[in-house]
Structure formats: C-alpha cells, structure tokens
Amino acid sequence: WLEMMEEDVREELSGTFLEHAPLVKVSAATGAGLDDLVKEIEHQTRDEVVQKDIHTIPRLPIDRVFTLSGFGTIITGTLVSGTITKEDTLQMYPVGKECKIRSIQVHGEDKKECYAGQRVAINLSNVKKKEIKRGCVLAPPNSMKNTDLLDVKLNVLDSSVRILTNHTRLHFFTGTSEVLCRAVLLDKEEIGPGESGYVQLRMEEEVAVRRGDKFVVRFYSPMETIGGGVVLEPNPK
C-alpha cells in the first residue's frame, strides 16, 4: 500500500520542481518516521538558509488580526525584512493609517524588537480590528505604494496545461494578500507552458507592493496555479 501511495505522489509531482524531491514515510498516528523527516529537512535546508535582510525597511504582511481584552488590536505575521522596535510609528497599507507599536512578542515571549524571518505578534495603538484584514502590510510611512496596476515579468510553469491569453482573469498572491486581477499581455498574444512575458496586472482592489516583490498567479476557474514572477513597476504611468 505504501508503495502505491508513493507512486501516486511521484505521479502527481511529475513535471514540477518537486519531481525529484526525497519522500519520507511518516505516520501521523504513531509518529513513526518523524525523526527521519526532521533529519531530511535539516539536510535539505543546511545549504539553503541565507542571512535575512535586517538592514532594509521593515515589512510585515499580516495573516491574522484580533482583539485582546486590556490590550486592543493584535496582529500576527512573519517579518519579511528589516527590524521593528517597540514604540516605532509605522503605517498600515493599503489602509493608510499610522499606528504605534505598543508591544512585541516572538514565540510567546515579550521582546523590545523583532527581526526579519521571525514570527511575531504585535500590539498596535491607533488602529481598530475592523480596519485591518489579512493581506494588509505594516511598514514605515511613505515606504510603499497602494496600487491597482502592476507591470510584472510573469513565468508560466512548465507543467501548466493551459495557456495565458490576453485579459485572462487571475487570482494574484503576494505576501499574505489574495486579489483578483486581469492580465494584459504587453509583448505577445499568449504565454504558454515554460514561457515568460511582460504583463500588466489590473487589480480589482488596491494592493501594497514594492518593486522586486515576488508573486504567484492562479487561474480564476478552475483555480489552478499557472506560475509567478516579479513586480517590475508598481503603479506604472
């Protein structure tokens, strides 16, 4: 039975970047194989871990927001760059509202500051829970742009079974945000599997991004991943 499952997984991953990835058999019921899984993860990541960028502007894509009695608004997320310090004044994008850092927790421990790569919970003042949602970004004032237009370089997966054509409706993912958009092809009539092209994405609501941000796109329906790319110009003129 395990051999059949392994064959099914290999078949599903065929043609993707995980095609030749190692498979580790683990039992969720007994825990058998967990040690092997940990060793394999350590082996795979040993040469992949890079120094996180703590010297650029702080950016925290928000994945959860809630209120706590006696504290107020709490946000959580993974800091993707820079450093956030208690008492900092930052801005919530695309809301546009400035807020102050009241307290910081990293893995349940109170900290005076947090660094890129850390999973954090931050207590904010001057902003309400209803003003924030998953996909918002906490960053310094005037450091990001809210936009509904993006010029991007888009790469279609080799394994894609569909072709990207002009004005295709897509799901756009970056950070923790998901927004619907239309793809306007700029340099060709269509982009097929394994091909790249320059595309303008016309968003159905504003997003907050910076030049160089990575993204993933999926077809609107059926919701299949088509590829991804990099933002070349937010808010192009």
Language-model features and meaning:
Residues 1, 11, 127-237:
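C-terminal effector modules of nucleic-acid-centric enzymes and ribosome-associated factors
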Residues 5:
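RNA/tRNA-interacting regions in translation and RNA-turnover enzymes
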Residues 11-160, 197:
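Conserved catalytic-core segments of large NTP-driven translation/proteostasis enzymes
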